[in-house]
C-alpha cells in the first residue's frame, strides 16, 4: 500500500501543514516543504507501527498545494 500525504501551505500561519487519511494521527507543520517532508519521513513509520499497520520500507506519496494571488 502507498501512503498518501497531503501538504498544504497555510498562508495565515506561514507554514506547510501535512495530513494523511492513510496515516491516522499524522498532523505536522514546518516553515519549509523540505523540512516538512523530512518530519513526515521520521513520524510516518512510528505512527503506522502504533496503529498496527505498515511494513519496512514504507512507501509515501507526497502532494503539495499552495494558492497565491499575483498582480497583472
Where are these predicted regions, by residue range?
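Short, charged, surface-exposed hinge/linker loops at domain edges
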Residues: 1-6, 34-72
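Flexible, active-site-adjacent loop/turn segments at secondary-structure boundaries
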Residues: 21-26, 46
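Short aromatic-glycine-(Arg/Gly/Cys) micro-motifs in beta-strand/loop hairpins
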Residues: 8-23
Amino acid at each position: 500500500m502507498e501512503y498518501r500525504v497531503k501538504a498544504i501551505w497555510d498562508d495565515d500561519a506561514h507554514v506547510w501543514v501535512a495530513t494523511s487519511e492513510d496515516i491516522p494521527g499524522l498532523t505536522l507543520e514546518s516553515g519549509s516543504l523540505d523540512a516538512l517532508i523530512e518530519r513526515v519521513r521520521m513520524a510516518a513509520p512510528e505512527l503506522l507501527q502504533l496503529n498496527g499497520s505498515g511494513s519496512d520500507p514504507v512507501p509515501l506519496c507526497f502532494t503539495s498545494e499552495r494558492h497565491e494571488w499575483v498582480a497583472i
